């Protein structure tokens, strides 16, 4: 998820 957890996931 983005935005949310990390820049990839």
From Swiss-Prot:
Domain Pentraxin (PTX): 1-9
Keywords: Amyloid, Lectin, Secreted
Keyword Lyase attached: no
GO CC terms of this entry: extracellular region
Chief location category: secreted
UniProt-recorded Gene Ontology molecular function terms: carbohydrate binding
Compartments, record wording: Secreted
Pathology noted in the entry: SAP is a precursor of amyloid component P which is found in basement membrane and associated with amyloid deposits.
Subunit architecture: Homopentamer. Pentraxin (or pentaxin) have a discoid arrangement of 5 non-covalently bound subunits.
Family: Belongs to the pentraxin family.
Protein name: Serum amyloid P-component
Organism for this UniProt entry: Mustelus canis
């Amino acid at each position: 998820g983005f935005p949310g957890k990390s820049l990839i996931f």
